Amino acid sequence: MKVVEVKHPLVKHKIGLMREGDISTKRFRELATEVGSLLTYEATADFETEKVTIEGWNGPVEVDQIKGKKVTVVPILRAGLGMMDGVLEHMPSARISVVGIYRDEETLEPVPYFNKLASNIDERIALVVDPMLATGGSMIATIDLLKEKGCQSIKVLVLVAAPEGIEALEKAHPDVELYTAAIDEKLNDKGYIVPGLGDAGDKIFGTK
């Protein structure tokens, strides 16, 4: 599995700011969007372009456009919504596919409860967004669903990943690509990433 830890200074700086224990909801949301945008830049670097001719201000001009790439952004509810706008800044016409999965706090197992996928998902590149890759359960369940519906090209964008989550994802889906702003130390006994960001969903939605 291709794993890319984005080491750009802006990404590292912004993730550092997100680790502050008393960060405001407003600031956390802003940073989640900004880092999501920067991760998108990295994740789409291999998109092919083609030459097309358009009508410019002074007549026809040849420009580069992304070649035949249909994209769907797949936020995992609810925390993934906090990264979605950062992705859409670059691809405002991308279709949105929503997957609802929560993690049982006792068993740490993923529990699916909702999905609404874009049409022609089998023809699209899926950019799956979720702030945290902890145990990997929710991400694996989401990718299972996408593949069941015929999606063959999947890239995962997360703010922070744990080694345990990366290992589980690679074992289940070695053909996906993972882009993360940080690979942290480990999971604690409650399945939270250490040092991590805390509960990203609570911080994004102001329910902490």
From Swiss-Prot:
Binds 1 Mg(2+) ion per subunit. The magnesium is bound as Mg-PRPP. The keyword RNA-binding does not apply. Uracil binds at residues 193, 198-200. The gene is upp. It comes from Vibrio parahaemolyticus serotype O3:K6 (strain RIMD 2210633). Catalyzes the conversion of uracil and 5-phospho-alpha-D-ribose 1-diphosphate (PRPP) to UMP and diphosphate. Allosterically activated by GTP. This is Uracil phosphoribosyltransferase. It holds the Pfam family UPRTase. Coiled coil: none annotated. It is an enzyme of class 2 (transferase).
